[in-house]
Amino acid sequence: MTKNKVLLALLAVVFLALPQSLCAQFNWKYTVEKGKIVTEVPQRAPGQTTALQLTTPKMPVVRVGFVGLGMRGPSAVERWMHIPGIEVVALCDYEAKRAEACQKILRDNSMPAAAIYSGEEGYKELCKRKDIDLVYIATDWDHHFLVAKCAMENGKHAAIEVPSAINLREIWTLIDLSEKTRLHCVMLENCCYDFFELNSLNMAQKGVFGDVIYAQGAYKHELSSFWKYYWKKNAQDKLGWRLEYNKDYRGDLYATHGLGPIAQVLNIHRGDRMRTLVAMDTKSFNGKKLVEKYTG
């Protein structure tokens, strides 16, 4: 077979595989128009309205259940201790000992002990409780959608650490549930609420910069020191999931830290929208060295 024929054969395989690959990644219908992937926007049911401006009755006390108390969850419990008018009702993690460890945070802040839930489906029992208003989700990424969906289906508001979902089907399902139940479903993009970002947003909204027509942002986070935790593939403590995403996917896996504050300044979904998105990355320069370090 000539080189040209071999090249054409390889290209044919790539293009035949591309739709299946993209469909699996998006888990959603799409078309390709002029070289761009265009995803479908689902039709709302009659009478169903957006939840972007949703307000709910004020609560004298917000009763919270936490799901996911590994690396990030305990610090979330700590932060909630500084918010007046809250009650921590339940703590849940795959491992009971991690949920139990957070009881000390409550004791140190003169709060009563919370109920403990554990195991792969402990969150389901937590979400069924009648005395919880909001479920705070800090699990591994694969469980963000599952817990948020369960929370809203059981009448609870959902607050989800980044990312809120991992494909378009999950994203649209959460939007649909929030609109139908009239419950808040919030992605906790913390970079939108730091002092610098909020100050910049306030200045933009007050016209200090005039008409904002261009914005640029970035997020840099050195994660090499976390590899000793992330490397625990199939570990009992479930920390090995993180590196799977870096291994299996390209582009920007964590775009919202840099993009979120910009979207607020540009009034995205509040009068404007994004029409085209492009994601790319460089090759991994240190990944191979770290893999060799942890595998020998």
Language model feature labels by segment:
Residues 134, 140-141, 145-193, 207:
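Beta-strand-loop-alpha-helix segment that lines the small-molecule cofactor/substrate pocket
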Residues 90, 134, 214:
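Short, Asp-centered acidic motifs that coordinate Mg2+ and/or phosphate
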